[in-house]
């Protein structure tokens, strides 16, 4: 069954460190850069951290897009912050690049580079929000000092964005809705759950990861249907997860609603809070955001690869069909309904939990 609920605040203290471990080897530290190098990079810190600003603009662009799938959001966030990170490190190299190979620009404006990289990625990948992105870009441009530094920054930002987009072209994200999922009969097999008559993004597990090797992340599979552990967990979900549960406390209901958001936006808000509270400079912020979003994007890929490999049924199917699971310790209840609508994907593993640990 799905993993236990873990309060979001428990992860905040280890947010950045856990992400770095999850994508070990990515965006490594360049030893030859100093704080003085960064201080000399053209930019205006009085305006605030441009990386944080563009992260917020990206989140705003996603917010109205109810139809956007969270896996696509995670991919866009990762591409966005890879491009921003690489643009900044072309000006002053403090960390290794995700997509190396374009010319350095030590006299470029850091703020112009961040804005141009973010603008290029968002307009390309979230075209339905192009007006919002263009308006934000124009507002920020008028705060920058015109001249060679701004021109160079704009050029390096666009180059970083295009290099990152080119690297991710052909990563199979565009075909992740195929092939359509066809349920198979039998105990333990995932079936569509109301109100859905489809399974979402069955091919997302074939999308190219940003960092990880999927072969190192295969899981053994869910508990055996006939095991005592399975019967115990099913009974727990049946009691606490029922729409009209008498054992679920008001606090548990609020926690469930809080965690129900099926999107990288929640952890992005936490990352942004940590970045601001720690006072990270643009280079540090760009690396932190990139690592967090690399980890979540790859978590979705690895999680969906396992979901559609194991094709494990959801609790509402399992509870209704418990008489057929071969376990004398389970009890069927065809009238059982979940507290919150079940997402249209197989149960195992829980990608909500995958994202939490990844971030």
Model-derived regions: residue spans:
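N-terminal secretory signal peptides and thylakoid transit peptides that target proteins
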Residues: 2-19
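Bacterial N-terminal signal peptides
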Residues: 18-26
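Acidic/polar surface patches and capping/hinge elements
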Residues: 36-359
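C-terminal segment of N-terminal export signals and the immediately downstream linker at the start
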Residues: 4-5, 25-45
């Amino acid at each position: 069954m799905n993993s236990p609920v873990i309060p979001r605040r428990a992860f905040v203290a280890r947010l950045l460190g856990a992400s770095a471990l999850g994508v070990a080897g990515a965006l490594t530290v360049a030893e030859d850069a100093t704080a003085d190098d960064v201080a000399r990079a053209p930019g205006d810190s009085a305006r605030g951290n441009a990386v944080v600003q563009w992260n917020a603009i990206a989140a705003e662009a996603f917010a109205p897009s109810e139809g956007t799938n969270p896996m696509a959001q995670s991919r866009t966030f990762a591409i966005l912050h890879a491009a921003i990170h690489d643009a900044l490190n072309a000006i002053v190299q403090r960390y290794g690049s995700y997509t190396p190979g374009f010319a350095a620009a030590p006299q470029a404006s850091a703020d112009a580079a961040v804005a141009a990289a973010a603008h290029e990625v968002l307009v390309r990948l979230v075209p339905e929000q192009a007006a919002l992105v263009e308006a934000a870009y124009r507002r920020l441009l008028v705060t920058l000092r015109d001249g060679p530094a701004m021109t160079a920054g704009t050029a390096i930002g666009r180059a970083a964005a295009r290099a990152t987009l080119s690297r991710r072209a052909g990563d199979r994200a565009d075909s992740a809705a195929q092939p359509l999922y066809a349920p198979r009969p039998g105990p333990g097999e995932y079936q569509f759950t109301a109100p859905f008559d489809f399974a979402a993004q069955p091919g997302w597990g074939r999308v190219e990861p940003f960092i990880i090797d999927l072969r190192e992340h295969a899981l053994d599979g869910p508990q055996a249907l006939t095991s005592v552990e399975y019967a115990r967990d099913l009974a727990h979900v049946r009691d606490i997860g029922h729409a009209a549960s008498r054992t679920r406390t008001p606090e548990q209901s609020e926690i469930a609603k809080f965690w129900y958001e099926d999107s990288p936006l929640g952890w992005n808000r936490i990352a942004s809070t940590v970045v601001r509270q720690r006072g990270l400079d643009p280079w540090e912020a760009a690396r932190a955001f990139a690592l967090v979003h690399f980890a979540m994007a790859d978590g979705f890929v690895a999680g969906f690869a396992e979901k559609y490999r194991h094709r494990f049924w959801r609790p509402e199917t399992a509870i209704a069909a418990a008489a057929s699971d071969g376990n004398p310790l389970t009890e069927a209840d065809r009238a059982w309904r979940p507290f919150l609508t079940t997402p249209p994907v197989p149960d195992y593993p829980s990608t909500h939990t995958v994202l939490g640990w990844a971030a």
